């Protein structure tokens, strides 16, 4: 078995970004002797090598690997879809739909000053974000954009903001100031309300890529959006993909666990994804919308296995925000969701049925 690490490391002084989930895949030699069905449904004994494409999209490394087709146009369309959705969900691109909504650059609905018509995709994702904000009672808050912008973990030299500025930003963060109706009309109830979808957008986009590939008869593929891994089926021989979870703060080649995954999403959130150190203290990007500072609850990572990647994306952040006990309770209350939590002592805590449903090997 050959180990392929789908990873990127970007260091801008104190800022480190890393992809958490690596894929352990069989080498091409392991496919010899088997015939594969390509995306047109015909058998192709020569096309046994997977096809893959990687590009920097959505401010991260996007990799799509297809195992049962040689049609590279499928890969091109996946990258085009990433571009399409980035123009909808980006918080920072001035031509994106979300940016225009946050900066009141859209025309208000007739007779209103704070309600705006948005696209189906943006309305759908805002609704999803609001549902998790409500489920977590604000521990996950899609109206956290003023606080996210203030901390700006993507800056060349990120710094801890002044407390008075943090408190000012906090006063603007409340998901209850956002509503969306069935006509795709979004209401921002205060002038300072702004939406941040970074915690769920990649999951949503991964699901849309899967929808597209499945519509093209692809039955074996891995979609990796910066560590949001979504498996379509399993390997061409019908065995499971092996997905490795990176050990927090370790070398990119070091995993803490390896799981057998088929037709599921695997998403992780951790304190080491985007962080910087100041005066001997590590500050990470998972901000508490109640205090304005990074969460400090004894967790360093949460991994969610789910059917839909958007749910895994939202839940990995939500469960982290809730802490080990309450995050575990939430994960165990949901159908078709499994999770494991890594505490600061590197102990792994599984939801009750995790190891019954998913084969996992701890590697540390």
Task: Enumerate the predicted regions with their spans.
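Mature catalytic core of soluble alpha/beta enzymes
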Residues: 2-19, 23-364
């Amino acid at each position: 078995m050959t180990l392929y690490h789908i990873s990127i490391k970007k260091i801008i002084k104190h800022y480190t970004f890393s992809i958490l989930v690596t894929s352990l895949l069989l080498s091409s030699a392991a496919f010899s002797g088997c015939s594969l069905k390509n995306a047109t449904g015909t058998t192709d004994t020569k096309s046994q090598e997977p096809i893959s494409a990687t590009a920097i999209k959505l401010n991260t490394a996007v990799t799509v690997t297809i195992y049962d087709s040689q049609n590279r146009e499928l890969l091109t369309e996946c990258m085009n879809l990433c571009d399409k959705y980035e123009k909808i969900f980006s918080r920072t691109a001035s031509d994106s739909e979300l940016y225009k909504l946050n900066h009141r650059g859209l025309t208000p609905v007739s007779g209103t000053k704070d309600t705006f018509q948005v696209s189906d995709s943006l309305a759908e994702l805002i609704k999803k974000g609001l549902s998790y904000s409500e489920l977590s009672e604000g521990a996950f808050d899609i109206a956290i954009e003023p606080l996210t912008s203030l901390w700006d973990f993507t800056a060349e030299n990120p710094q801890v903001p002044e407390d008075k500025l943090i408190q000012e930003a906090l006063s603007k963060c409340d998901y209850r100031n956002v509503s969306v109706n069935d006509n795709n009309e979004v209401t921002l109830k205060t002038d300072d309300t702004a939406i941040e979808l970074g915690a769920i957008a990649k999951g949503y986009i991964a699901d849309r890529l899967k929808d597209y590939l499945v519509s093209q008869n692809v039955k074996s593929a891995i979609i990796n959006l910066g560590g949001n891994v979504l498996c379509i089926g399993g390997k061409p021989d019908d065995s499971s993909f092996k997905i490795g979870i990176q050990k927090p703060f370790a070398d990119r080649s070091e995993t803490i666990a390896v799981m057998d995954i088929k037709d599921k999403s695997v998403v992780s959130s951790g304190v080491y994804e985007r962080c910087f150190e100041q005066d001997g203290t590590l500050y990470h990007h998972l901000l508490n919308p109640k205090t304005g500072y990074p969460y400090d609850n004894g967790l360093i990572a949460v991994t969610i296995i789910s059917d839909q990647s958007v749910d895994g994306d939202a839940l990995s952040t939500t469960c982290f925000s809730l802490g080990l006990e309450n995050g575990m309770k939430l994960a165990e209350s949901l159908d078709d969701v499994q999770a494991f939590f890594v505490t600061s002592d590197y102990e792994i805590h599984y939801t009750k049925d995790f190891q019954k449903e998913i084969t996992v090997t701890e590697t540390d």
